[in-house]
UniProtKB/Swiss-Prot annotation:
A GO cellular-component term linked to this record: cytosolic large ribosomal subunit
Descriptive protein name: Large ribosomal subunit protein uL30
Top-level taxon: Archaea
Ribosomal protein in keyword set: yes
Organism of this sequence: Methanosarcina mazei (strain ATCC BAA-159 / DSM 3647 / Goe1 / Go1 / JCM 11833 / OCM 88)
Biological process (GO), any one: translation
PROSITE patterns (UniProt xref): RIBOSOMAL_L30 (PS00634)
Keyword terms: Ribonucleoprotein, Ribosomal protein
Homology family: Belongs to the universal ribosomal protein uL30 family.
Length: 153
């Protein structure tokens, strides 16, 4: 499962890239979505790689984001009780592990908003104009996306 975080704004962005961002539901800076690994999403993420940070997320980080930033319709927080009552899982951590393994989907939680609004990272970005290979934060982080998401919790 991919975590994709928008890091750059929409000024001077080509229409096709902005359209792809809308399809991914990344309308604003510091918004995050979780996507399954398939060729369709992989191509879309590859197209917007110069405006986002992405990588493979682990269960611990997914549970942390769901607990801290998960919102239901009406801007209510996602709680352990809500997960227990509305899914087959006992906790957010168990649900996150099932999602990462592919046994469950975020759509299994009724009324869960698909976009997670994150804080800017603590201690700042390494630079939003450069890729990870050049010392910035844009592009494919692979497993290190978990560090960025922890900073943005």
């Amino acid at each position: 499962m991919y975590a994709v975080v928008r890091l750059r704004g929409q000024v001077n962005v080509r229409y096709t890239i902005e359209d792809t961002m809308k399809m991914l539901r990344l309308h604003k800076v510091n918004h995050c979505v979780f996507l399954p690994e398939n060729p369709h999403y992989k191509g879309m993420v590859q197209k917007v790689k110069d405006y986002v940070a992405y990588g493979k997320i682990d269960a611990k980080t997914l549970a942390e984001v769901l607990e801290n930033r998960g919102r239901l319709e009406g801007d209510a927080r996602l709680t352990e009780e809500y997960i227990r009552e509305n899914t087959d899982y006992d906790s957010i951590k168990a649900f996150a592990e099932a999602v990462v393994e592919g046994k469950a989907s975020l759509k299994d939680v009724p009324k869960l908003k698909p976009v997670f609004r994150l804080h800017p990272p603590r201690k700042g970005h390494a630079g939003i104009k450069r890729t990870v290979q050049q010392g910035g934060v844009l592009g494919n982080h692979e497993e290190n996306i978990n560090v960025l998401l922890h900073k943005m919790r």
